[in-house]
């Protein structure tokens, strides 16, 4: 796995601030190329990508990308950990419903894997809560936008398994443009989905009205 940072970090010392996608933890990605992009958020400023190895044997792993795991579960985890400003009753009620019905207690898990949702991608979440994207549209926008996967190490047991395997300097001249290209791709996917009418789609208003649950086949 690779960790993106401005400095070499031989031994992660603990959690990042609580308001991250899956709560406090050590965030990495299993994809080296993606880590290199994340390491270069500024034009002209090289980054550093640290490499780690993690033995998952015996660890409790929650995979939010696994087959059978609804996008609503991913959304519920996000809105349970990241502050979301909502301005309408339906968005407020929808957020609370997601937390209550589709939320997952992360305490039993040592590691969480799933899509990332930085600020540009969080538009998907807000649009869904505001009833302008359907469940299917959110799923398509996430896949087509190339969000990328992240792995969050959250327990002491998992931290003890992390082994530092080196680091590399990442040239911004190469990876900053790639990062911006991925960001633009996600924004296009979002705009394309928002412009399309999903007349038969399942929206947050429908979920609230029908009290849709995790076993409903329409959310698979």
PLM feature segments, named:
Residues 1-26, 34-36, 40-42:
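Glycine-rich loop/turn
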Residues 8, 20-21, 37, 41-47, ...:
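Conserved NAD+-utilizing ADP-ribose enzyme module
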